[in-house]
Amino acid sequence: MSRAGKSVRRQLYVRDHSLKIGGVLYVVAVFQFFVFELVAETLYPGYSVSGNYISDLGATCVSPPSTLNCVVHQPSARIFDSTVFLLGLILLVGTGFVYYGTRKKPYLVTAAVADLAILLVGVYPENTGWTHAIVSVVLFLFMGISLLLAWTIVNGAAIRYLTVAFGVLTLFFNFTNVPAGQVGVGGQERLLVLRILLGLLTLGGYLTGQDSPAPVS
């Protein structure tokens, strides 16, 4: 093989392994959140998946973003804040690897902003008032956009339509209250978050399963 051919093959090897690492990090981030969010729920006295917001696990306020009449239940708050922080941090690192393998700047920017917003939700729980409210809005908005743009890093795969669908649904239900009457505010938020997590798992699973060329010596 010529020197130029070896160089191209080596670049492809590094690129594909960056995508694999990014995909693994996406999957790990989501699974650890699934597990520890459930643990936080079980330790929260009288928690209702339909009546309570997910962020209530970090701090519960009667009328958010007002910081009046807020209560923090430990250890559920500490567990929840930690798993949200880890979710954002691991996703942010994973997005860096995905960018290294794709060089798609629109996806990088939107995904990185969303990941950073997730991280900040873990730093600023519900009892921080408008700070929490603002980063939550940024989270849902940019995560929906990033899932839409994920089609640019899924080459020739039908799975790209799934990420687009998750992105569209995330943005649509972020600005509507369609299911709130049937499932409560907690159920409504969970449906929104679930679309995001499933979108990330779909993308992460795709990237993890990519075939890599053999390394070049």
Q: Residues of each region from the PLM?
A:
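Membrane-interfacial loop-to-transmembrane alpha-helix junctions, especially the N-terminal start
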Residues: 22, 26, 103-111, 156-166
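Hydrophobic cores of alpha-helical transmembrane segments in multi-pass inner/ER membrane proteins
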Residues: 2-3, 86-93, 141-149, 194-209
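Extracytosolic (periplasmic/ER-lumenal) interhelical loops and adjacent juxtamembrane/interface segments
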Residues: 46-76
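Membrane-proximal helix-loop-helix units in multi-pass membrane proteins
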Residues: 108-151
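Short, Lys/Arg-rich, polar N-terminal cytosolic tail immediately upstream
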Residues: 1-17
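Individual transmembrane alpha-helix segments
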Residues: 65-98
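N-terminal signal-anchor transmembrane alpha helix
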Residues: 17-46
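Terminal transmembrane helical module of multi-pass membrane proteins
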Residues: 150-217
